[in-house]
């Protein structure tokens, strides 16, 4: 199961339901981790506009508050590649938009 460390601001926004998409820059580190976990070809799925929809199975992940023991669990129902300009990252580069569903804090 993938673990996404988050800053407190983003952790709280996801927890409240205000934020439903987590963004990660399209770099070899995240491409490798995502392609292994979600079983896709990282070299074929690498252009803005590409969409990977989880039709039959939603993948579980953990969203952790920094490097503490506090975390939430969520399901990923879609990953797409978008321009990061209008995202939390605010960069003019391709980014993974990881769509979250069924977010629950684990106590």
Language-model segments: what does each one mean?
Residues 1-2:
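Short structural boundary motif marking the start of a folded domain
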Residues 5-107:
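Structured alpha/beta reader/binder surfaces that contact nucleic acids or chromatin modification marks
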């Amino acid at each position: 199961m993938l673990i996404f460390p988050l800053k407190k601001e983003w952790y709280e926004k996801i927890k409240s339901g205000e934020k439903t998409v987590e963004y990660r820059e399209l770099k070899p580190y995240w491409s490798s981790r995502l392609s292994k976990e979600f079983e896709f070809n990282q070299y074929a799925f690498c252009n803005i506009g590409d969409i990977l929809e989880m039709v039959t199975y939603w993948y579980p992940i953990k969203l952790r508050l920094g490097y503490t023991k506090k975390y939430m669990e969520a399901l990923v129902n879609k990953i797409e590649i978008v321009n990061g300009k209008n995202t939390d990252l605010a960069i003019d580069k391709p980014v993974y938009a990881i769509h979250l569903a069924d977010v629950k804090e684990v106590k």
